[in-house]
Amino acid sequence: MGTSMEPSSSKPEQTFVEELRRRRAELRESMSALELALAGPAPEDQARWAERVRVALVELSADFGEHVDITEGPGGLYGELLQAAPRLSGSVARLTREHALIRGLVDDLLERVSPPGANEDVDRVRDLGTALLGRLLRHRQRGSDLVYEAFQIDIGGET
């Protein structure tokens, strides 16, 4: 299955919305896994803690990469959105800029906990990880608001 999110006559709107929600849920699950890893005990075995954080970050990085592909890529959500509502180009540009910022935060954290067993300051990694999760949360909220404004479709909630 490709990463295109483009609704077409062969892919009804409902399927498009379901796929969008499914992918949002995957990203949210990755965010939750990172939150749990960051909150885990670290003082006694920092190497194991760092490895759990690294594994969660690798998964988050992959899911975020898919998010960028389905929003910015050919046939992606942002192209469809701009065709439907060109007035929202400023909001699309903002979300696109956020992708680069968030990617940088993910990459920085991965460097701090790689290779496994890296002796990085736990509190600093937690602070940076928490800041990353906050950025992702706000990005998701803005994305949900944008889709609703363009299409009057609520993609925000996951069950």
Task: Give the location of each predicted region.
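Small-residue-biased structural context
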Residues: 1-159
